[in-house]
Each structure stands twice: as structure tokens, then as C-alpha cells.
Amino acid sequence: MKGEEQLWTILNDKLDMLRATNRLPQAIRAAETALEIAKRAFSGTDLSLATSFEKLGQLLDQKGDRAAAKGYLLKAHTILEKVNPPDQRAIYRSARRLAFLCDSLGQSEEAINFYQKAIAAGAEIEDIHYSDLGTMLNNVALILRKSGRQKAAEPCYLRALHIYEKQLGPDHVDVASVLNNLAVFYTNERRFTEAEKIHLRALAIRENLNPPPLADIAQSKCNLAVVYHSRGDYAKAAELYQASLKMWEQVKDKPLKDYEIVVSNYADLLSSLGQVRKAHQLEVRARKKRSG
């Protein structure tokens, strides 16, 4: 048994070296051999066995065989969940990897389950970066929204905001980005009063930064214009669309996708007000900028 444990250690070192030098097929073969040895040398709840399942799963994922990778990563995670006391860092790492994998495979419910496990474990670890938790909460919210569960999505946005504010304070640029996501969610839900309030806060944060992030400010002004546009306050919407366009034109000579969104929204507003010629002129101008 001792000899097999030593051989397992040697093989793991070898596969790490092979992986580091981009010799993926050889690394996978070494990982498969190491796993067979681990099954003989270690108990079914030993962390070394979990390591072997995990490493082979990672290599298969790197190869692009995500379906096969998932099976090995699930076996590793099952072992990690049985360890007492639990290793929260290992559970976080494993659940996070499975969440992103399931998400990429379109397995939404499993992805939500593993995102939630990773978030719960990550909350117990002091040095987990706030943006990692925020990204996972945002991903859960997107899955829930796509499946029509808007009410369930809102707490994810609110929790992400709480995490960012706790780590960074209320006036940080990253807090403004989270506020923007929340406000867009409220706009889509036609909760315009809440959306307006939060967009105004995000805009204020961005405008007070030095140097001011012009693209972010342009985005905030466009999003706020959408709120006013949606509830029929066309004068405010037009003013903000114009301001957003002006800022986008300062960002780059050629327009970005966001610039074209503002053009489209503003042109729709002008057309709805009977200003068809002005809307056409705006679209022609945008096409000229797009063509350089």
C-alpha cells in the first residue's frame, strides 16, 4: 500500500509537469493511471482520491470533453462533502468549477445548485475576492430570469450589491456596475421608480470619479433614458440620449455596440414623436461613423 501511495504521488507530480508544458494527452493518461492507483490505495472518502478524480476532470475539461469531465468532478465533489470537518476552500473551488461547467452545458438547475454551494462556502472564506461571489450571484440571477423566475432573481442582485458595498464602500466604481445591473433588472420588470433611483445613484458615482469613465457615464445616461422613455417622459429621455451619444463620440472615433444601441433607442423615440426625418438623419450619421 505504501508503495502504491508513493507511486501515486510520483504520477501526480508527473501529470502536473505534463500539463504545465501543454502535453495534454500524456497528462490525461498519467491522470487515468493515477486514479486507478488511488482507487486501490485510498479509502472512498480520502482526499487523495478526490484529488485524482478532480485532476482527471480538469484535464478532460481542458481538452473540451465537458460531459466526461463532469462525471469525475462530481465524484470528487461528493467525497469533499463527506469530509468532516469540511474543507470550505476545497468545496468552494469544486462547486464553483462544477457550476461554470454545468452552466456552459446548459444544465441550468444543476448550475444554480453548485453556484449556491460555492457562494455558501465562499462566504466562509475571508480571502475570497468579492468579484468572484458577485459574478456567481449575477449568473444565478441571469439563469433565474431566463426561466421566468424574476422574483427569485432579485435577492441575488441585492446580495451582490451588499457584498460589494461591504468590501468597497458605497461609492466605488465596481459598486456602480452592480447598481447598474440591479437597475436594468428593475427596468425590465417595469419597476421604473426603483430603476430611476438606482440608475441616478450609479450615475452620480461614475460622474464623481477622477478621471471620469466616459463610457460608463454614457451607459448610465442611456439606461436612465430608457427608464424615462418607457414611462413616457420623452423630454428627459431625449436629453439623456443626446448626452449619451455625445459621450460615446468622445470615447472612440468609431462607435461601439453600446453607441449603436443609443442611436437605435433615440431614433425610435424621435419616430414615435413624428420626427421621422430627424430619426433618419441620426441613423445615417451613425452608419457613416460605423464605416469610418
Q: What residue ranges belong to the model's regions?
A:
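TPR-adjacent "capping" and linker segments in tetratricopeptide-repeat scaffold/adaptor proteins
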Residues: 1-10
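Short coil/turn linkers that connect adjacent helices within long alpha-helical scaffolds
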Residues: 1-2, 40-44, 82-86, 124-128, ...
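Conserved alpha-helical positions within TPR/SEL1-like repeat arrays
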Residues: 9-20, 47-62, 89-104, 131-146, ...
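Amphipathic alpha-helical segments of tetratricopeptide repeats
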Residues: 35-40, 77-82, 119-124, 161-166, ...
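TPR/TPR-like (Sel1-like) alpha-helical repeat modules
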Residues: 241-246, 264-291
